From Swiss-Prot:
This is Defensin coprisin. GO terms for biological process: defense response to bacterium; defense response to fungus; humoral immune response; innate immune response; killing of cells of another organism. Residues 21-37 form a propeptide. Has the structural arrangement of an alpha-helix connected to antiparallel beta-sheets by disulfide bonds (CS-alpha/beta). The alpha-helix is amphipathic. GO terms for cellular component: extracellular space; membrane; other organism cell membrane. It comes from Copris tripartitus (Dung beetle). Potent broad-spectrum antibacterial peptide against both Gram-positive (B.subtilis, S.epidermidis, and S.aureus) and Gram-negative bacteria (E.coli, S.typhimurium, and P.aeruginosa). Is also active against all antibiotic-resistant bacterial strains tested. Induces apoptosis in C.albicans, but does not disrupt the fungal plasma membrane at all. Acts by permeabilizing the bacterial cell membrane, but not human membranes. Also shows potent anti-inflammatory activities, since it reduces both LPS-induced nitric oxide release and pro-inflammatory cytokine production. Belongs to the invertebrate defensin family. Type 1 subfamily.
Amino acid sequence: MAKLIAFALVASLCLSMVLCNPLPEEVQEEGLVRQKRVTCDVLSFEAKGIAVNHSACALHCIALRKKGGSCQNGVCVCRN
């Protein structure tokens, strides 16, 4: 009985995956959207006296192998 239930579960999962796939003419390829202001808008906050404002931007720029960076008008600008 347990094998029958397991088989029915696997079969229903496979069937649902096949039915949920979009048709080839329905597939829409959209470009990747980059949010350039995330490090300066979302991550600029202060909690218990600790401000993250320009630190998140500087870390982002260092990860891009730049010398650092800061927020200017809500946009992270990296130094060369």
